[in-house]
Amino acid sequence: MNGIINVLKPAGMTSFDVVSHLRRVAGQKKIGHTGTLDPSAVGVLPICLGSATRAIEFIIDKDKVYRAELTLGSATDTQDSSGNVIFSGRVDADENRIAEVIMSFVGETDQLPPMYSAIKIDGKKLYQLARQGETVERQPRKITIYDIRILRIWEATERLPGNVAGSVPQPEVQVKKALFEVHCSKGTYIRTLCHDIGEKIGCGGHMSFLIRTRAGRYDLDSALTLEEIKKLALNKELESRLISAETVFDDFESIHLSEKEAFKYNNGVWLKINYQKDDTNPFIRVYDYNNIFLGIGEIFNNGQDTCLKSKKFFIKD
């Protein structure tokens, strides 16, 4: 099978767990996910099968939309509600101040990746080091928050995350919460955004809920639950529900090749072409003379001519 399944990831599963599950259900060896979604989070997780796995890097590069709940009054070691409290403070900020601080994160900024993340340093994932009690130096990464839409801010009484000595539940405390929608670039950690908001207010904060509502062009409306996917597979209907990898590149310009050009292109030959390309994106959808999608090409100048070379082939496996 070749194509994309837009999965509605449930809470409690890692992105790799979802891939392993679908590998068994679909009987598919060549399969991969398009970017880690926290185990506690739910939402859109496009999974690529067969030749569509060549589109993974392009989907990862797309912007994302999340809906998150921020709890103010405590910070945790994981920056979400699964961790233990490392700082707690009284929330004196009113609704206007909270909203002001949240909105101050809109724009391009440097974000320090959390220790509890899948980023690798010297071959080891950060979360593996964190579980061993280690903290290592990380470099901030450029991210962009395109927009934040605050949906609600309210007060609540709840127990702090984690346990105190002897596994005794934490006491109940007064907290403030904010529910907001954020549109951001790839590589943005919403947990870290919540942590940083709490730090800027001065009371500590952590992410208490997260749902990814969109990854690139794939949204909740087209997402399938694992139960739905299993039923489709049992009924031999899953392949008919796969989304073409071509859809990943809907916003790319396109070019059609003659029979002679297509033959050369498919054999890795650079083609001299007469084409005025958008400088902001060197990549282009390539079709043959029968309007069959061949893959993604790259437009470049060799010093004399405008040329086309293959970047990714999407001829079905």
Predicted regions and their residues:
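Accessory RNA 3′-end/elbow-binding domains used by RNA modification enzymes
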Residues: 1-10, 14-33, 37, 41, ...
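The conserved catalytic core of RNA pseudouridine synthases
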Residues: 24-28, 46, 136-202
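Glycine/acidic-rich beta-strand-loop module
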Residues: 30-60, 128, 132
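Residue-level signal for inorganic ion chemistry
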Residues: 47, 68, 123, 193, ...
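Structural signature of FAD isoalloxazine-binding scaffolds in flavoprotein oxidoreductases
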Residues: 57-72, 136-150
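Acidic, low-complexity central loop/insert segments
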Residues: 58-113
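Extended alpha-helical targeting/anchoring segments
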Residues: 117, 121-140, 145
